[in-house]
């Protein structure tokens, strides 16, 4: 069972011009604690609800934080992905191609 067989593309992604307020609303709507941040189609990092809540101005744009960037290749085994999700306490894990292109995410569910 490879990760690529479990990718969901229904998870919204963030861009650097999105506001913290917008990101928090998406997290609430999708019941997630993390969302991937992309630059064009390249995965940059995982933005957490905790980090967004710590920002002094929720109407400010997210910018280009590269704080925490866990991801897994589409060709890795599903058990590796689940181990990463558990180890880091993630609500989702971004899946990337060999060249770093964001393909989607897998969730605990």
Annotated model-derived regions:
Residues 1, 18, 47, 60, ...:
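Short beta-to-alpha loop/turn elements within the nucleotide-binding domains of ABC transporters
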Residues 19, 51-52, 64-65:
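Histidine- and aromatic-rich ligand-binding microenvironments
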């Amino acid at each position: 069972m490879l990760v690529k067989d479990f990718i969901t593309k229904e998870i919204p992604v963030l861009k650097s011009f999105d506001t913290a307020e917008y990101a928090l609303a998406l997290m609430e709507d999708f019941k997630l604690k993390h969302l991937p941040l992309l630059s064009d189609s390249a995965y940059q990092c995982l933005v957490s609800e905790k980090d967004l809540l710590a920002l002094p101005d929720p109407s400010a744009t997210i910018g280009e934080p590269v704080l925490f960037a866990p991801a897994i290749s589409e060709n890795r085994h599903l058990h590796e992905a689940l181990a990463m999700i558990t180890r880091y306490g993630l609500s989702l894990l971004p899946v990337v191609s060999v060249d770093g292109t964001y393909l989607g995410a897998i969730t605990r569910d």
